[in-house]
């Protein structure tokens, strides 16, 4: 994974602000992520259906590993937040390309 994250950090980054953060989740960490998904979903919608609850419960187990991308943008006089968010998107693309080049199957999803 070191190679993959090195590729991610080569994404365009105006002013070298380094806005991208990555969280790698696998194994038992997916249980905690499942709980976070359910808790957040309940906070956003108090009337979740059983189908929705099942979706959020099972989502982290669709893959053996999950990489979460976070854009931690900073105030800067010449670099607006949108450029920093796009930089994180480019880092995500580099992750996908690196994993593909290494022979891994992958997908980009949101729930």
What is the predicted function of each stretch?
Residues 66-70:
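Active-site-flanking beta-strand signature of metal-NTP-handling nucleotidyl enzymes
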């Amino acid at each position: 994974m070191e190679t993959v994250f090195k590729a991610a950090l080569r994404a365009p980054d105006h002013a070298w602000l380094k806005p991208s953060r990555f969280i790698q989740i696998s194994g038992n960490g997916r249980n905690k992520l499942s709980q976070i998904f359910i808790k957040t979903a309940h906070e956003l919608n108090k009337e979740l259906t059983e189908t929705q609850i099942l979706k959020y419960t099972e989502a982290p187990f669709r893959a053996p590993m999950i990489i979460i991308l976070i854009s931690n943008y900073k105030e800067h006089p010449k670099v607006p937040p949108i450029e920093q968010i796009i930089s994180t998107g480019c880092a995500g693309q580099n992750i996908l390309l690196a994993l593909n080049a290494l022979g891994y199957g992958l997908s980009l999803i949101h729930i």
